[in-house]
Amino acid sequence: DKYTAYIGADNYDIGLRAGEYVKSCMKNGHSVRILEISGMRASTPAEERHNGFEDAMHNIEDAQVRYIEADWTYDVAFRRFSQMLISDKWVPDFIFAHNDVMAKGAYAAAVNAGCEKDIILVGVDALCGNGLGVDLVNDGVLDASLVYPTGGYKVAQLAMAVLEGTPYAREISLSTEIVTASNARIMQMQHSQISMMDDKIKTLDSLLDYRTMEYSAQRKILMTVFVLLGLVLILLCIAVYGFRRALTLNKMLEIQKQQIEVQREEKLA
């Protein structure tokens, strides 16, 4: 209870949806071998994903289920699955890896053993980008990957609601979606379009910064010109005042001179 609000992915639902996908790929009347590759089992995401997957698998008869803990990493997943393939000669029909990185490591081990075509491989994260989950699905490395939602926009909305004191849900679970070969290409295209728009926004932002700096520089130059013009105007006013003052003094001196000459002529007369 020592938190204001929580928003995050439903890891149990991710495991459950992965299990449901695996079940949909099973053939009736056949025993199956299932391998679950988890992260650190003591971690909450790993435990919740395992529980969801286990609940989806609980009513499957003749299922052999094994587990590998791979610490969320490619190298550990590759090494431990390779050991299983070599020492036990046990090839699973399905692999559910708790992230796409471990799924990729398991695929590499299967390729080395020559059994990659016999395994349906499911991961988690479904990130877009070179060599990431959506690419792996599109390239046939993974059969499916569950989206791990981050909800950035919803997080911002929730934070604003908390700050503004408006009503908000205290706990928000973000739903997942499954990416398969049928929609991976669409997601790649959407991501490419978003990336292009993001690049355009960054370009416009840089242009705006440049224009702002240019405007600021021009404004400073204009202010300097105005100051200089003001100084010139003040100096001009002083010069005009001095000139007019000089004219006035000259007139006064001329009058005084004329008066002195008149007085001198009167004395001579």
Where are the model-predicted features located?
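Hydrophobic alpha-helical
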Residues: 52-53, 66, 70-131, 156
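Hydrophobic alpha-helical segments within soluble ligand-binding/sensing domains
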Residues: 6-33, 76-79, 103, 128-133, ...
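Loop/turn elements at helix/coil->beta-strand transitions in domains of secreted/extracellular proteins
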Residues: 2-3, 29-33, 59-65, 90-94, ...
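Short, charged amphipathic alpha-helical "coupling" segments at sensory-output junctions
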Residues: 254-255, 259-268
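Alpha-helical transmembrane signal-anchor helices
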Residues: 208-258
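Sec-exported extracytoplasmic/periplasmic mature domains
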Residues: 20-27, 54, 58, 82-89, ...
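Hinge/cleft segment of the Venus flytrap/periplasmic-binding protein
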Residues: 41, 45, 57, 147, ...
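An alpha-beta-alpha
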Residues: 16-67, 159, 168-183
